[in-house]
């Protein structure tokens, strides 16, 4: 799983290109940290997946369209899981995984 510093470095590059996203970057970093430390395997794995996707996007292996499709699919899966989970777990999925995806998507769309 990508470290907090690796994610921060990826997002700092995005901030240099698009200064308006700094508050989104701060929120993403905090939410990513929460997801990595969550007791639920699914939440931790989703955070790792999102981090890997961001790394591959930064390397140029995924373009913006690929990222949007990938993240929207992951968001749909997370919503299904949240809806089928116990209330407390569903709330954590919504506040971490779905929020991470929403921030990443908003940043991508804003960069287009």
Functional labels for PLM-detected ranges:
Residues 1-112:
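Cationic, hydrophobic amphipathic alpha-helical membrane-interacting segments
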């Amino acid at each position: 799983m990508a470290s907090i510093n690796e994610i921060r470095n990826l997002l700092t590059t995005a901030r240099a290109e698009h200064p308006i996203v700094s508050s989104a970057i701060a929120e993403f970093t905090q939410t990513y940290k929460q997801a990595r430390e969550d007791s639920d395997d699914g939440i931790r794995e989703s955070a790792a997946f999102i981090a890997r996707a961001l790394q591959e996007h930064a390397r140029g292996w995924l373009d913006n369209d690929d990222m949007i499709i990938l993240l929207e699919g992951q968001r749909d899966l997370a919503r299904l899981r949240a809806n089928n989970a116990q209330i407390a777990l569903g709330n954590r999925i919504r506040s971490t995984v779905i929020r991470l995806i929403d921030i990443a998507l908003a940043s991508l769309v804003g960069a287009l």
